[in-house]
Structure formats: C-alpha cells, structure tokens
Design a protein with these regions (language model features):
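Conserved N-terminal beta1-alpha1 strand-loop-helix module at the mouth
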Residues: 1-93, 109-196
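Leucine-rich repeat
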Residues: 96-97
Length: 196
C-alpha cells in the first residue's frame, strides 16, 4: 500500500497516532514542542514514542517559541526537521533546514517575500488555510507545500492535484492511554491509499 499524495501529520502527542501514521506510510510526523501550547509533548514522552516509529521524517514543531527555547530543546532531541511559524526573526538564527507553518494568510501578506528571501533554509511550507492567491508567494523550486484539509476533502484534493501539493493532517489526543478514535485521519488516509 502507498498514498496518492505526500502526507504530513502535525501535532502528534501519543503513541497511537504515531504508530498508525507510520503504518500508513505518511512522510512526516510532527510533534508539538511549542512553549506557548497547552498540548505540548514532554521530551521523555517524545523519545519513547519516537523509538516506535520507523519510516517517516520526524519534525519538532515550535510555533512561535523563542530561539533560546528552541536551541535548548534541540540540544536534547534528535529530529530531521524543525518547524516554526512564519517569523523572519527566528529563521535567521536557525542553521538547520526548517519547515515554515503559515497559520494565517494575513501574516503572509504583511511580509510576502519571506519565503523567497529564506528559500535556502526552507525544506517545506505547511499552510493551515490555503487559498489560490497564496501559491505565487510560496511555490519555489525545492520547497514542498502541504495544505490542511479544513473543509471538504474533495475541495482540498482538487487543489492538491492542481498545484501538485502535499496534504497536512493533524493528530488529536487519546481518549485514554491506548484508546484512540482516528476518525478524520483514518478516513482521509484510507481515501488516498492505493493497494499494492
């Protein structure tokens, strides 16, 4: 089995999501380390979960965290990429290839050249609320774009095909340890899976 599109699953904070996504051959799994988030994962929990994952690239998601906080965490964990929100100050201080998350298109319009000016440091861009007007500001050679399925998946899939984009999904909390309702993630991953 494989998936029709490249898939990034964000905000994973439990073993159930991580193992399920790994078994479905998603490409990236992101873990929430944002210092401002109530749902951030502990380093110990992350390390325990990471030991069970094989295949996907591992992303540490820092959102709007300070550079001091990011550097402290990056010295304690091993990941393939780190993700930050659209922020020109932080990216200048990061020496690792990173992922940029655009959570609000209005922020992007305030600094439309951000991706272009930092394209040598950016591996991919994730967009929470994509519309067609954004494509010219984010599409550069060597940078993959992943968009979140906020409305109907049918509408999202049209954009995936039209612009050759990847799909961004989000993990959720377990109902209790080891017990998980996968609803949205499993429905979409099953929809885009191709049996081999």
């Amino acid at each position: 089995m494989y998936l029709k599109y490249f898939v990034y699953v964000s905000s994973v904070n439990n073993l159930s999501d991580a193992r399920y996504c790994s078994g479905m051959f998603v490409d990236y799994i992101g873990f929430n380390f944002d210092q401002n988030s109530k749902n951030k994962i502990s380093i110990d929990n992350f390390k325990e979960i990471k030991n069970w994952i094989n295949g996907p690239k591992i992303v540490a998601e820092f959102g709007d965290s300070s550079i001091t906080y990011i550097e402290e965490f990056m010295s304690k964990i091993e990941v393939d990429y780190l993700s930050i929100n659209y922020s020109s100050e932080i990216i200048k201080k990061i020496d690792k290839n990173c992922i940029v998350n655009i959570s609000d298109k209005n922020i992007m319009r305030q600094n439309p050249k951000f991706i272009e000016e930092n394209k040598n440091k950016i591996k991919l861009v994730t967009i929470d609320d994509f519309d067609d007007s954004m494509i010219d500001f984010v599409k550069y050679e060597g940078i993959d774009i992943f968009i979140e399925s906020k409305k109907s998946f049918l509408d999202t899939e049209k954009k995936l095909k039209k612009y050759d984009l990847g799909l961004k999904l989000s993990g959720s909390n377990e109902l209790r340890p080891g017990y998980k309702d996968y609803n949205n993630i499993s429905d979409i991953l099953n929809e885009i899976s191709i049996p081999t």
